[in-house]
Amino acid sequence: MQTIRKSLGLVLIMFVLCGFIFPLTVTALGQVLFPEQANGSLVKQDGKVIGSKLIGQQWTEPKYFHGRISAVNYNMNANEVKESGGPASGGSNYGNSNPELKKRVQETIKQEGQKLSSDAVTTSGSGLDPDITVDNAKQQVKCIAKERNIDASKINHLIDENKQASPMADDYVNVLKLNITLDKL
C-alpha cells in the first residue's frame, strides 16, 4: 500500500511539474527574453497583423514579388485544413527523378517564357518558405517595374538593400519585407 501511495504521489508531482510549472516557466521566459519570436515574429502595419517574417504567404498581384511555389497552396487556416483534410504545411514529396516534378517544372518554365532560378520552380520542404533567392527576385523585377511604372534600377536597389547573406546557400530576401518596402516607394 505504501508503494502505491509513493507511486501516486510521484505521478501527481510529475504531472504538476511537467504539465504546469515547466510549460508556464518556458512560456514566461520566452515572453520576457524573446517577445517577438515567442509571438510568431508577426509583422504589423497600421496596427494590423499582415503576416509573419517566418511564414510565406501567397502573392497573386503582378505588382508584388512572388514567393516560392507552395505544395500546400499556403494553406495555414486551421478550419480549411479540417474541411479539406489537407496538410497545413509540407513539401510535395516529389523526388528529383519523379516525372510529375519534371512535368510541373517544365510547365512553369514554359509559362514564364524565360530561364528561372531553381527556387522559382520548386517547393520548399515546408511549403511555406518566406524567402526567395536574390536571383529569383531579380528575375521578377522587369514585370514589377512595368506594373508599377517604376524604374527597374530602383527595384534592384531595393533588393540589394534587403539582401541577407547565407553561408551555406545563395543570398536571399524575405518576400513580405520586400513587398512592404516596395509599397513605400
From Swiss-Prot:
Stretches with biased composition (Polar residues): 114-126
Keywords, comma-separated and alphabetical: ATP-binding, Cell membrane, Ion transport, Membrane, Nucleotide-binding, Potassium, Potassium transport, Transmembrane, Transmembrane helix, Transport
Membrane topology: Single-pass membrane protein
GO MF term set: ATP binding; P-type potassium transmembrane transporter activity
Quaternary structure (record): The system is composed of three essential subunits: KdpA, KdpB and KdpC.
Role: Part of the high-affinity ATP-driven potassium transport (or Kdp) system, which catalyzes the hydrolysis of ATP coupled with the electrogenic transport of potassium into the cytoplasm. This subunit acts as a catalytic chaperone that increases the ATP-binding affinity of the ATP-hydrolyzing subunit KdpB by the formation of a transient KdpB/KdpC/ATP ternary complex.
Name used for this protein in its record: Potassium-transporting ATPase KdpC subunit
